[in-house]
Structures are given as C-alpha cells and as structure tokens.
C-alpha cells in the first residue's frame, strides 16, 4: 500500500490575486499537498477537505467595498492555523473586529518591515538588523487599502512607516496576517515564512515528493483501470509525454499511444518522438501521418482563431478514427494539469476570459463510451517536469520552451502551406541551435521563429532574389502573463540571420521582434 501523500493538506482560498497559483506552487515546493479553491466555499466543503491549515490569498478588490469577497466565517472556527496574505490579511482583520481603510497612498514594490514583537511566524528570520537590534525583513508590497486597527486579541508583529500593521498575529489561535506577498522572490525570506507556517505551525510533513507522487499515481491508475485498455493522444509535449510514461509504468502494453503527425511540428520532431517512446522506452505507438489532411483543411484560411479550431477539429477526427480501430479500449487518458482544472473552475464561475482558444482531445464519438484517466490533474507544470525527470525523460525535452498546441499552424501567419512550414522549420531549428551553442537558450523563457507571408528583395552573389521574410522572437517572463523582449547580443542575432539567409533557400530577410507583452502577445497569432 502506498503512503497517503494527501494526508497533510493546505487549503488556499483564492480572492483573485495574480500570485495565487504561485502561493500554491510554493506550498507544493515545501513538500506539502494543497488545493486552490474560490473564496466562496461552504463550511461543508471545508470540513470535507479537512485542511491542516488555511491560506487566504491576495486579491484586487477593496475590503472597504460593501460586496467585496469575504472568507467563510467557518475558516476562523475550524480550529486550524490561518495565514492571510495582503487582501487575505485585510478581510481577516475586518471579519474578526479590526478596521480597514482605503489609503491615499498605494504601496507597491520593495519595502523594509521592522519586527517589533516576537511571533512564531518570523522568529529567527531576518534580512538585517536595526541599530538597536530589531530584525528587518525585505518584502514586496502591493496594496491600496491598509489595516488601521487590528482585532483586540491580535498583536502587532511588524510595521513600516506607512503601514503600522505589516504583520499581525494571534498566537493562541495561530492566526497570522501579512500585508506583503511572501510567495514572490522579491520577499527574500518569503519561503522561510511559508515554511514556518506550513511545516511548523500547521505541522505538515513533507510527503509530496516526485518519487511518492509517481508511486501514488501508478497505484491510482491501476485501481481505476484494472486490466482495461487505455488510449492516449501523444504529442511529444511535456504533459502527454509524462502521462504516457506514468501509464506505461502502471499498465504496460495495455496503453496504446496515438501519435498524429499533423505536418505542423518542429524539424525532425516526429522522428524524435517515435524513436524515444517507441524504440527507447518500448511504448505501444500508432503513428498516423496526417500532414496532407491538416493542410487541406487549412487551405485558404487566414484567420488565427479559425485555424486553431480547424486544427483542433481535424485532430479529434483523426484521433477518433484511430480509436475506433482499436478493440476493447475502455479509457481515454489526457494530460490535463492542475492549472487547466483551475481555469475550468474559473470559467464556470465567470471569472476568466478566453484570449485564445486551447485545443485538446475535445470530443469522442458518441458510440465510444470511455472513462477518463487524468493522472496529472493535481500537478503544476513544474511538478510535471520533475516527475518526468524521475521517470527517465531527458532534461532537454522536459525543459524546452513552450510550443503551441496548433504548432506551426499559428507561427505561419495567414494561410498555412507546406512550403511555408518547411522553410519555417529549418529557420527555427537554426535559431534554437545557435541559442543553445551560445548558452542563451535557458536564459530566455521562450524563443521561436515566425513566417511572414511577405516577400522582400535580397542579393545573392551577382543576382537578386525575391523571397520570404521570417521574424525571430525571444522573450523573458516569469509567468507568461507579461513579458519583455529579450535583449540578445547583436553579434548573435547577426550570426543567426546570416545562417538562415545562407542555408534556407527561399528566405531573403530576417527581422527581430522587439514587442513586449502587453501590448503584443508572445505568439503572433
């Protein structure tokens, strides 16, 4: 019997902060399981989850507004430690008898807080000392409102000149509030504070580790599917690859992977996927060459969203046809990860907007009554990668830059043609190869090449040529919500440009995209 890795668990209530998922990832990094729920949960749901502790996230609302979100009152009656972050601290203060006011000055960015009273949350944690020996902490603030009176049974733990209650605590009830964000790296001791809360105050053991997660996933897959057969759409991306490896470990030859080669992959990618999973790891793979079918469906279509939908639809059609050829398949596996689950929940509550549609195996034939196996649905992307390493997948594959589901279909601007894809594949391979050679690949968050359907005059030897243009794109980002264009060295860009123009017959000009996000998106389509 595998160990219960969910035994100790933290509940994070989401009040809408852009950093909330980061809080959850930090708790997981400490080896403790946690879940992220909307703030308006019921007492019954909290009782059922039975958390070892509760974290109240930050949020964009103002607690001074009449209908702003509040923590369920049961949070403060459950008898477990509670940690309020930013908005979470303000709603805690207000709900327990303190007072919050809108401030004239918004405090955003670096601040230094002075610890004025002892507390289990920050005992022995400091960045510097004042002249009279008081601990100082370097933190990241982001708030407009501030607590002006703490509840009567709380003490002030730390303050700044403009924020008299930067940390408050009720040690007896183990309630803590901080007016800054411990989850961001700018708060230098933030991880130690979270560790103090999760591991010491909530007394959670570090049971959530890659090896134990794998054992748990394998046991759950076996329990769910037994001796039944399972089908998986394998793309070669991180999520489907790790899903394939987990299922292979759990059920061996009862897994069939369908690899649809849509003609929109990177250079030699199809061969690499088949070699690695088929020849090296011994998975049972059905290879479906479908380039002509995808390109025919895309012919004449210029609209990016329409292209995404076509690629998604044709993939489902091809996958369904292959699934129908297999006998006795009872289960469909998918590489759904935890942020997908959170996104779906947000959509259900009307709190998320779709900027670009994502495609997955969306529909299965009505006659196929299949169950769903989603072994990664509790995991964040960084956890999926760590598990992949533990399962023996190569680092370069797990940590390569994101590649869109529709592939080159949205990196060829406008109509997608085989000629354009072939040129783009070769140009992109040169860019990535040079990034790796210059030790720049891991210093940027994402880099790729875009095919522009415009011709430009060039000179080759004594002759003129009139060929296509490609754009190089490289960005630096923490969360992909915002991004800066990467300041790559000019001599490096010159080398890449020369190689592409000289080695890829059909491209006459290379440009570099210097747009940030916002206003531009990272992908061009």
Swiss-Prot record:
Domain GMPS ATP-PPase stretches: 208-400
Record-linked CDD domains: GATase1_GMP_Synthase, GMP_synthase_C
Entry keyword annotation includes Nucleotide-binding: yes
MF GO annotations: ATP binding; GMP synthase (glutamine-hydrolyzing) activity; GMP synthase activity; identical protein binding
Enzyme class: ligase
Keyword ATP-binding: yes
Sorted UniProt keywords: ATP-binding, Glutamine amidotransferase, GMP biosynthesis, Ligase, Nucleotide-binding, Purine biosynthesis
InterPro entries (alphabetical): Class_I_gatase-like, GATASE, GMP_synth_C, GMP_synth_GATase, GMP_synthase, GMPS_ATP_PPase_dom, NAD/GMP_synthase, Rossmann-like_a/b/a_fold
Residues binding ATP, per UniProt: 235-241
Signal sequence, start to end: none
Active-site residues, as the UniProt record annotates them: 86, 181, 183
GO process annotations (BP): GMP biosynthetic process
Induction: Activated by cAMP receptor protein (CRP). Repressed by DnaA.
Regulation: Inhibited by 2-fluoroinosine 5'-monophosphate (F-IMP) and by N(2)-hydroxyguanosine 5'-monophosphate (N(2)-OH-GMP).
Reaction(s) this enzyme catalyzes, per UniProt: XMP + L-glutamine + ATP + H2O = GMP + L-glutamate + AMP + diphosphate + 2 H(+)
Subunit annotation: Homodimer.
Free-text function comment from the UniProt entry: Catalyzes the synthesis of GMP from XMP.
Name of protein: GMP synthase [glutamine-hydrolyzing]
Gene for this chain: guaA
